C-alpha cells in the first residue's frame, strides 16, 4: 500500500488529519478542528528506534488502530475489539491503508461527512522492534519480509502494550484480515486492557 490511498480517501480542506507534503511537513487545514500534537518532552519514544502508536477511534463503530512505523510510513491495522494482552484472546486486525508518519502525533476530531468521522485519541505509544534484534535497520528488513510472508513477530515497548506480539495473516480469508496475538510472556494477562481509557479521553474537548 502507499499514501496515495490515504490521500484519495480524505479532503484535507475539511479534515484536520495530516497530509504529508513533499517537504515532509503536514499540509492539513489548521483553521479547522485542531489535531493535538503531543509535546515532544512527554514522549516515551527514543531516537534510533521504530515507533508505534495505537489510536482509539470513535467512528461509526468504536475500534482501535494499530500503527507501526516502517519504511517511512505507518503500517496500519484496524482492531474492532481492541488490542489484547491475553494470549488466549486473538483479535481480528484488518489491514488498512498506510498512514503518514505525522499521524503518530494526531489526536483530534474528524468532522462529520469525512472519512472516518469521529473522535480519535492516542491510546498508547512507544517503540517496537523485530523479535531477535533491537537494531532499527535490521528490524525494518525483518519486519518488511515478515509482512510479505504474512507473519510478523515483534516486541512492543509502550506504556500499556509491552512484550512480544504477533500479527498473522489469515490464509482462508481476505488478504487484509490478520490476527493480533499476544505471546505468553511476563507481560501477558487475562485483563481486558482495551477497557483502559486513553489519557485524553476524559477531557471535555481537544485542545
Task: Give a label for each model feature.
Residues 1-207:
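A charge-rich, low-complexity, intrinsically flexible signal that marks solvent-exposed coils, linkers
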Amino acid at each position: 500500500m502507499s499514501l496515495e490511498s490515504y490521500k484519495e480517501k480524505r479532503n484535507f480542506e475539511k479534515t484536520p488529519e495530516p497530509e504529508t507534503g513533499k517537504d515532509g511537513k503536514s499540509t492539513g487545514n489548521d483553521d479547522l478542528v485542531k489535531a493535538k500534537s503531543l509535546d515532544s518532552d512527554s514522549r516515551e519514544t527514543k531516537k534510533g528506534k521504530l515507533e508505534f502508536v495505537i489510536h482509539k477511534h470513535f467512528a461509526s463503530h468504536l475500534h482501535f488502530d494499530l500503527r507501526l512505523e516502517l519504511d517511512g510510513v505507518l503500517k496500519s491495522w484496524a482492531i474492532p475489539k481492541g488490542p489484547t494482552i491475553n494470549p488466549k484472546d486473538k483479535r481480528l486486525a484488518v489491514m488498512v491503508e498506510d498512514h503518514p508518519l505525522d499521524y503518530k502525533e494526531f489526536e483530534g476530531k474528524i468532522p462529520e461527512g469525512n472519512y472516518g468521522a469521529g473522535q480519535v485519541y492516542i491510546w498508547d505509544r512507544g517503540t517496537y522492534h523485530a523479535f531477535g534484534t533491537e537494531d532499527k535497520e535490521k528490524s525494518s528488513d525483518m519486519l518488511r519480509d515478515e509482512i510479505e510472508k504474512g507473519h510478523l513477530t515483534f516486541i512492543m515497548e509502550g506504556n500499556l502494550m509491552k512484550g512480544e506480539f504477533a500479527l498473522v495473516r489469515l490464509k482462508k480469508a481476505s488478504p487484509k484480515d490478520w490476527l493480533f496475538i499476544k505471546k505468553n510472556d511476563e507481560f501477558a494477562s487475562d485483563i481486558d486492557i482495551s477497557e483502559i481509557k486513553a489519557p485524553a479521553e476524559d477531557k471535555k474537548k481537544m485542545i
